[in-house]
UniProtKB/Swiss-Prot annotation:
The gene is tig. Belongs to the FKBP-type PPIase family. Tig subfamily. It comes from Pectobacterium carotovorum subsp. carotovorum (strain PC1). Keywords: Cell cycle, Cell division, Chaperone, Cytoplasm, Isomerase, Rotamase. One of its GO terms (biological process) is protein transport. PANTHER family: TRIGGER FACTOR CHAPERONE AND PEPTIDYL-PROLYL CIS/TRANS ISOMERASE (PTHR30560), TRIGGER FACTOR-LIKE PROTEIN TIG, CHLOROPLASTIC (PTHR30560:SF3). This is Trigger factor. Residues 161-246 form the PPIase FKBP-type domain. GO terms for cellular component: cytoplasm. It comes from the Bacteria. PROSITE patterns: FKBP_PPIASE. Its EC number is 5.2.1.8. It catalyses: [protein]-peptidylproline (omega=180) = [protein]-peptidylproline (omega=0). It is an enzyme of class 5 (isomerase).
Length: 434
């Protein structure tokens, strides 16, 4: 077997292999002998068909199969010998072949990039320092009460966090635009569901009033024909409702899994959940900065085959979220996922090198701690822990999470870390908008 390797472009490689004629003929003869033992041909007993008859009947197809098998086996031998690490499915390109002669063919494929990490000590990370205060717990309790609130109709003027029922008709230059009209529209104010200025124009009016408000659509509004346009809305205010918050009674508190129904127990449970969320938010905030720094410091070529594979994964995930099937997943535009797919591939390659060069292995104690932390959010944590223990795939997934964390911490140990005190709400708002 003769082998030559050349670079086509970037990570592209072409291996050219020549298989000697005697190797081919020996393999063909061996396969024909095996075939002669199995084939049935009229006029001959099984296993007694003469070789020349078998060769005449099956020789061409056997030779084709032999060449295909030799192409694959010799390619594998070649990349092992040349220490080549291919990515994705190779493209086999057969050359001209005449019976009795050598056979030359090519295989084109991509290889993994050589990654040599650099600039780790120049990565800058701002680590949030946060604690859950009593005031934070008070705010969260108020949020829980608002989520469980009921609505009561009122005669007073609408306020910023009321719920209103309205009819409205929107127009631009006197012409009603598509989607600008609704009847009995229920609007919970204070949630920024409408364009800027709309809710402000409703505040101060009472049920039964008819009025108009002038607003401007944002420049980045999703509808192209409305971007930046001045509009007028004619509004009929039909109903104003105010929120009635539930008292922190024993019955109310027990809804949140606090067995004794005490306010102290509820505060403790809320604080525990907030601290768990906080821990995850800090971890993710730091991780994002580490990964951004790692990517910026290490520009690498990315195999197209890996990006294509990741795009397929993202397509399927997107389709599943919206109840789609495999066919619908493949119809989703590639451009929607290309940037995210490339980032994920780059991160995987860089962290893979961190893991390899530092000989990292998943810390089982960390794996167990991650499972326990995740399970603590469920009603029966022990049941979740036992479920993970019995499910090999889930357990391996958690090992990968732990190993990734260890790789991030390895990079973080070499980075420039500055601590910054922030409030709970500030951090969680940053996380929500990231």
């Amino acid at each position: 077997m003769q082998v030559s390797v050349e670079t086509t472009q970037g990570l592209g490689r072409r291996v050219t292999i020549t298989v000697a004629a005697d190797i081919i003929e020996s393999a063909v003869k061996s396969e024909l002998v095996n075939a002669a033992k199995k084939v049935r041909i009229d006029g001959f007993r099984k296993g007694k068909v003469p070789m020349n008859v078998v060769a005449q009947r099956y020789g061409a197809s056997v030779r084709q199969d032999v060449l295909g098998d030799l192409m694959q086996r010799n390619f594998v031998d070649a990349i092992i010998k040349e220490k080549i690490n291919p990515v994705g499915a190779p493209n086999y390109i057969p050359g001209e072949y005449a019976v009795g002669g050598d056979f030359t063919y090519s295989v084109e494929f991509e290889v993994y990039p050589e990654v040599e990490l650099k600039g780790l000590d120049a990565i800058e990370v701002e680590k949030p320092v946060v604690e859950v205060t009593d005031a934070d717990v008070d705010t969260m309790l108020e949020t829980l009460r608002k989520q469980q609130a009921t609505w009561k109709e009122t005669d007073r003027a609408a306020a910023a966090e009321d719920r209103v029922t309205i009819d409205f008709t929107g127009s631009i230059d006197g012409e009603v635009f598509e989607g600008g009209k609704a009847s009995d529209f229920v609007l919970a104010m204070g949630q920024n569901r409408m364009i800027p200025g709309f809710e402000d124009g409703v505040v101060g009016h009472k049920a039964g009033e008819e009025f108009t408000i002038d607003v401007n659509f944002p420049e980045d509004y999703h509808a192209e024909n409305l971007k930046g346009k001045a509009a007028q809305f004619a509004i009929v205010l039909k109903k104003v409702e105010e929120r009635e918050l539930p008292e922190l009674t024993e019955e109310f508190i027990k809804r949140f899994g606090v067995a004794d129904g005490s306010q102290e127990g509820l505060r403790a449970e809320v604080r525990k959940n907030m601290e768990r969320e906080l821990k995850g938010a800090v971890r993710n905030r730091v991780k994002t900065q580490v990964l951004d720094g790692l990517i910026n410091a290490n520009e690498i070529d990315v195999p197209a085959a890996l990006i294509d594979g990741e795009i397929d994964v993202l397509r399927r995930q997107a389709a599943q979220r919206f109840g789609g099937n495999e066919k619908q997943a493949q119809e989703l535009p590639r451009e929607l996922f290309e940037e995210q797919a490339k980032r994920r591939v780059v991160i995987g390659l860089l962290l893979g090198e961190v893991i390899s060069s530092n000989e990292l292995k998943a810390d089982e104690a960390r794996v167990n701690a991650l499972i326990e932390e995740m399970a603590s959010a469920y009603e029966d944590p022990q049941e979740v822990i036992e479920f993970y223990g019995k499910n090999k795939e889930l357990l391996n997934n958690m090992r990968n999470v732990a190993l990734e964390e260890q790789a991030v911490e390895t990079v973080l140990a070499k980075a420039k870390v500055v601590e910054k005190s922030v409030s709970f709400n500030e951090l969680m708002n940053q996380t929500a908008t990231a």
